[in-house]
């Protein structure tokens, strides 16, 4: 059996991976970011669910903040959701904090060069957030201590728009994909972004939307494209 928590155009959902205390759904933009307790927590509104962000709470800016289907990433270790919070040329990340308490709140990471289009949280740290951010203008940003820091370092700048990024076996190894035609669609670094290699190989000129390195085999990478799922073993 299943339970419908919400409906509409849909968006990215997030589930607490550590203690499975909550899940988060989104509608469009940051217009209806909804937190649901899975363990019976009563939030400050007196219910077991609450809006983290919604234009219905009187803040009309939420209904156009970010993208229509808005990207984000959940740090389950620290109970923080990072989401695109850009609006009207002001490029920033919205940081929803204290998600495991009955009074979550939010703030912003500001000063980004362009609008975030992809996020990835390192699995190699657990007491702080190491956050990778890709933008719609091809920049790759690294934010260490993103749970408290407001400073992003640019470690890559490519032609196209970033669709996905991942750390590999450590935080020096990074994979990046771009979803445009006529560009290099897969980039790779083994030194934290000092040097980048092109990894399209024999892939056709097609948008690449996702990438997943195999944690058990350093040579194997799975790639999601507009023309199906591909893999490489070298």
Give the role of each language-model region.
Residues 1-234:
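Extracellular glycan-interacting surfaces
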